[in-house]
Amino acid sequence: VVEKGKSTDGLMRHIRNTHGVDINGSTEKQALLNMGYYHGYKASRYIKKSTNLQNYDNFQEVKAIYDFDIEVKTIFYPLLVRIETSLKNRLIDYEAKPVGNKDYKKYLNKKLELRNKIDSTIAYNYSKGHPCIQHFFHSSKPLPLWAYFEVTTMGEFGNFISCMDVSYRIEFTQNMNMHHTGFNQNGRMLENIIFCLTGIRNATMHNSMIFDCRFNNSNFSSQLISYLENTTGIKNIDFESIVDFLILLIFLMKKQHTTKTELNRVVSQFDKKRELLYSSIPMKAYSEILGTDARKKINGLKEYISNG
């Protein structure tokens, strides 16, 4: 049996009486309805872990967190789509060029688990009627790499790259102007970047909270962090703050020859939302969410863009 639950007026009383958060009037009632109690209000009250509840005095502070989260996702969503598509297309283009021995099937044969994953991904999309997959099956043609990449997740794409031969991985990162002899000796740079982006990509696409990086569930490569700090000149990157993901996205967009105007527009958009958050919530909460050096990192990012 499904219980009815509280009315919005009842929820507002509960928020006032139990949480000590001041919420009143039709405007705040509509805002609560728009964000939702569990997905919006409750998820905005804590930072990183549900045990780390913040003592906000009024509903506007909670709403400022929620609004910041939505705005950052609005900025990040097209960037993540563009970067994922571009990386896949560049690998497809690279595969098509006759450079050295690039038989990716030979490398994938070593990884039975990945081969099984590829087969199950293709079978799943065939059963769901994906037109591209069905076309090649019904034509009795082998499935080209671009068609497989069209239906893969970001994580599967990272696994695909990880199964390539080391010389092949290095060659591809060189082709993208991302190889560094000090930080990419094992050719793992690109897969580390992809695995780093997978959590935020999935959280953004599924409209989960990203403002405090609660989607982080893996250790990030120290090689990647050192490389990013070395390339951008920005220190103390640890991916505990959403600002660090902005740095990685700008770095990748710059490697993909995005104009300085566009890069500056993205950073400026983010910085306006950061400043608004700064002026809307207690300093303790702001520092926990974005760290104490967010403004410094943003300035470093602007400098990195102008130097390129």
Positions of predicted regions on the chain:
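Extended intrinsically disordered or low-complexity regions, especially N/C-terminal cytosolic tails and loops
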Residues: 1-199, 211-308
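Acidic/aromatic/glycine-rich contiguous surface patches that form carbohydrate-binding/processing clefts
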Residues: 207
